[in-house]
Amino acid sequence: MAKAQSKQATATNTPRLKQVYNETIRKALQEQFGYDNDMQVPRLDKIVLNMGVGEATADSKKPSVAAEDLALIAGQKAVVTRARNSIAGFKVRENMPIGAKVTLRKERMYEFLDRLVNIALPRVRDFRGLNPKSFDGRGNYAMGIKEHIVFPEINYDKVDQIWGMDVIVCTTAKTDDEARALLKAFNFPFRQ
């Protein structure tokens, strides 16, 4: 009795996209690419959200505000990133806070991906699809979002400044074609 209840509880707590991957996407990719082993099938590894704050040189509090917004979007605490070395042209000193980042894995990664594809991307102004050439050659995909207010967690009235952000989707795919097939299966809206 207890085992049946715990199994049912874990099934309901599993993110929707993770269930879709385990039930349909994995089998489809295995047939498409002819993998012998289940572990060869590409899967999502992590999603990194990065927010660079250019105004950090004038006001050192801006990166911490960006980190708070990023934490709301991601659902976990963001880390303030610091400059590795000084660049006089940008008025940046070594170890100065210049942005924020979050690395999402496991359940939070799937939950964020669901919100990104189904809620945030359709809310982007003049959105015509994602660039299908933004793969890095090793099965990872990077994209930029110009306004972080497209996420439902951000209250537009309380935002004092709009920042852009990078979203990097890392996969275990060996080639860009495998990664493209994986992300298309997750309903990424690539341009034709």
Curated annotation (Swiss-Prot):
<keyword id="KW-0820">tRNA-binding</keyword>
<keyword id="KW-0689">Ribosomal protein</keyword>
<comment type="function">
    <text>This is one of the proteins that bind and probably mediate the attachment of the 5S RNA into the large ribosomal subunit, where it forms part of the central protuberance. In the 70S ribosome it contacts protein S13 of the 30S subunit (bridge B1b), connecting the 2 subunits; this bridge is implicated in subunit movement. Contacts the P site tRNA; the 5S rRNA and some of its associated proteins might help stabilize positioning of ribosome-bound tRNAs.</text>
</comment>
<keyword id="KW-0694">RNA-binding</keyword>
<dbReference type="GO" id="GO:0000049">
    <property type="term" value="F:tRNA binding"/>
</dbReference>
<dbReference type="GO" id="GO:0003735">
    <property type="term" value="F:structural constituent of ribosome"/>
</dbReference>
<protein>
    <recommendedName>
        <fullName>Large ribosomal subunit protein uL5</fullName>
    </recommendedName>
</protein>
<dbReference type="InterPro" id="IPR002132">
    <property type="entry name" value="Ribosomal_uL5"/>
</dbReference>
<comment type="similarity">
    <text>Belongs to the universal ribosomal protein uL5 family.</text>
</comment>
<keyword id="KW-0687">Ribonucleoprotein</keyword>
<comment type="subunit">
    <text>Part of the 50S ribosomal subunit; part of the 5S rRNA/L5/L18/L25 subcomplex. Contacts the 5S rRNA and the P site tRNA. Forms a bridge to the 30S subunit in the 70S ribosome.</text>
</comment>
<dbReference type="Pfam" id="PF00281">
    <property type="entry name" value="Ribosomal_L5"/>
</dbReference>
<dbReference type="GO" id="GO:0019843">
    <property type="term" value="F:rRNA binding"/>
</dbReference>
<dbReference type="InterPro" id="IPR031309">
    <property type="entry name" value="Ribosomal_uL5_C"/>
</dbReference>
<keyword id="KW-0699">rRNA-binding</keyword>
<dbReference type="GO" id="GO:0006412">
    <property type="term" value="P:translation"/>
</dbReference>
<dbReference type="GO" id="GO:1990904">
    <property type="term" value="C:ribonucleoprotein complex"/>
</dbReference>
<dbReference type="InterPro" id="IPR031310">
    <property type="entry name" value="Ribosomal_uL5_N"/>
</dbReference>
<dbReference type="InterPro" id="IPR020929">
    <property type="entry name" value="Ribosomal_uL5_CS"/>
</dbReference>
<dbReference type="GO" id="GO:0005840">
    <property type="term" value="C:ribosome"/>
</dbReference>
<dbReference type="InterPro" id="IPR020930">
    <property type="entry name" value="Ribosomal_uL5_bac-type"/>
</dbReference>
<dbReference type="InterPro" id="IPR022803">
    <property type="entry name" value="Ribosomal_uL5_dom_sf"/>
</dbReference>
<dbReference type="Pfam" id="PF00673">
    <property type="entry name" value="Ribosomal_L5_C"/>
</dbReference>
